[in-house]
């Protein structure tokens, strides 16, 4: 039986590829977790923006309804 003279090199290369793919997968998992955190914070900002916008509309409505709305300075 003839042995493959490149077998050891191929095994080493495959081992390095597998190790690098595992590192890449871990990095992608970490990135996904951070993106989830960013999305949660952005959602909170979006809600706060909607609250401020609704408050502004309410104030404008009440100023118009009471006749107290004045032009900007």
Swiss-Prot record:
> Mind listing the UniProt keywords for this protein, alphabetically?
Cell cycle, Cell division, Centromere, Chromosome, Chromosome partition, Coiled coil, Cytoplasm, Cytoskeleton, Kinetochore, Microtubule, Mitosis, Nucleus
Tell me, what is an example of a GO biological process annotation in this record?
protein transport along microtubule to mitotic spindle pole body
Instruction: List the residue ranges forming a coiled coil, or say none.
Output: 14-54
State the Gene Ontology terms under molecular function. Answer: microtubule plus-end binding
* GO cellular component terms given for this protein: cytoplasm; DASH complex; microtubule; mitotic spindle
Span of the secretion signal? none
Location of this chain's protein in the cell: Nucleus; Cytoplasm, Cytoskeleton, Spindle; Chromosome, Centromere, Kinetochore
Task: Look up the domain of life of the source.
Answer: Eukaryota
Chief localisation class = nucleus
**A Pfam family it matches:** DASH_Dad4
Assigned protein family: Belongs to the DASH complex DAD4 family.
Assembly, in brief, is:
Component of the DASH complex consisting of ASK1, DAD1, DAD2, DAD3, DAD4, DAM1, DUO1, HSK3, SPC19 and SPC34, with a stoichiometry of one copy of each subunit per complex. Multiple DASH complexes oligomerize to form a ring that encircles spindle microtubules and organizes the rod-like NDC80 complexes of the outer kinetochore. DASH complex oligomerization strengthens microtubule attachments. On cytoplasmic microtubules, DASH complexes appear to form patches instead of rings.
Tell me the function of this protein.
Answer: Component of the DASH complex that connects microtubules with kinetochores and couples microtubule depolymerisation to chromosome movement; it is involved in retrieving kinetochores to the spindle poles before their re-orientation on the spindle in early mitosis and allows microtubule depolymerization to pull chromosomes apart and resist detachment during anaphase.
Name under which the protein is recorded: DASH complex subunit DAD4
Tell me which species this is from: Candida glabrata (strain ATCC 2001 / BCRC 20586 / JCM 3761 / NBRC 0622 / NRRL Y-65 / CBS 138) (Yeast)
């Amino acid at each position: 039986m003839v042995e493959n003279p490149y077998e050891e090199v191929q095994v080493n290369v495959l081992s390095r590829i597998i190790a690098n793919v595992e590192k890449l997968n871990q990095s992608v998992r970490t990135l996904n977790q951070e993106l989830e955190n960013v999305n949660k914070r952005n959602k909170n900002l979006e809600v706060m923006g909607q609250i401020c916008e609704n408050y502004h509309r309410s104030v404008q409505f009440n100023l118009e309804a009471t006749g107290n709305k004045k032009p900007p300075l």
